[in-house]
Amino acid sequence: MCSMNVLTLKNISYSYHSLREETPALKDISFSVKEGEFLAIVGPSGCGKSTLLSIIAGLLAPESGSIITNSANPAQEKTKIGYMLQKDHLLPYRNIYQNVMLGPEIQKIDTPQVQNYAKELLKEYGLSDVMDKYPDELSGGMRQRVALIRTMVLNPTLLLLDEPFSALDYQTRLYVSADICNRIRKANKTAILITHDLSEAISLADRIIVLSGRPASVKREVPIHLSCKRDDPIVTRTAREFNEYFEILWKELYHEKH
């Protein structure tokens, strides 16, 4: 893996504001993400994981701290960030191919080359036969693959995944998450995954960042080294190191240290 950092966060803090009060959400969060790395972020519900992802995406501005990318101009780097949400947000009145091409159309880069690339991705993901179908004709797993293709067609350098598998049933979630992760790795993309599922984080990530409760801060970073390939989500979960990592994460999240 290349040692170059794609993204570095330094002392990021953020608060929610209302007419009555200010609620601290993030406090002095610092970490880096290396090129080609698959990073997972876990933490208690409501601790601000999605808020942190929105700041990385440039949708929110931090109150303090800085975000450094490998681009000399961070504003240019925003166009290279892909965001995949919990819901696929496929437009019901556009067919699958049209949904995939939505981003290029908005950015006015829907050239013949990009159109061909979109069709190549659909073929690679086994979805070329459903290009003319509409979202309500596809299964949940297929819809999430379409959502990933819609993100990948813009050729992002960094993928932000905000619990993209949580709406799927458990069995589908296992295989779709592993499939999508493997495709991201194959494309040599850098990814940050937000998840509540510790098993999912262990089976997919190269490294896991554990956040504390609100205001969230970095409690621990856990590098993941499994003795098996990650192609099969069932095999991954039977790796001899898996339970050890799970116990480490569980204690960090749910056991108070005295």
What role is predicted for each listed range?
Residues 57:
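Helix-to-loop junction immediately C-terminal to a conserved catalytic motif
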Residues 42-44:
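The feature captures the beta-strand-to-loop junction immediately N-terminal to the Walker
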Residues 65-77:
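Conserved ABC transporter NBD signature motif
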Residues 148:
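Hydrophobic anchor residue at the start of the ABC signature
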Residues 133-136, 154:
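Conserved signature/switch motifs of ABC ATPase nucleotide-binding domains
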